[in-house]
């Protein structure tokens, strides 16, 4: 008997579940890289696209926004960036919860 894990069968079960989480995390990483999440500002005049890892992919500006002052354009860009980042981070958090939410690792006091 290994201290903290109980009988050998529980160790095998814990290792199997850990492998499932690892495999799921690898799939999730690929999904996050392929996602496109759009943050907007100014009723869609400014759009920033990031992937599920919060990496910037694209910025789109409606030509109408270029008639505004530099300060306004900067504020709109920042707002769209924060919006995209927030959505991406929340998506990542939810997906990680889905991945690990039902996993119980016996003997570790988790789940």
Swiss-Prot record:
Disulfide bonds: none annotated. It is found in: Cytoplasm, Nucleoid. Its main location: cytoplasm. GO terms for cellular component: bacterial nucleoid; cytosol. Pfam families: YbaB_DNA_bd. GO terms for molecular function: DNA binding. SUPFAM superfamilies: YbaB-like (SSF82607). Keywords: Cytoplasm, DNA-binding. The keyword DNA-binding applies. Homodimer. Belongs to the YbaB/EbfC family. Binds to DNA and alters its conformation. May be involved in regulation of gene expression, nucleoid organization and DNA protection. NCBIfam families: DNA_YbaB_EbfC. This is Nucleoid-associated protein CYB_2894. It comes from Synechococcus sp. (strain JA-2-3B'a(2-13)). The lineage of its organism: Bacteria, Bacillati, Cyanobacteriota, Cyanophyceae, Synechococcales.
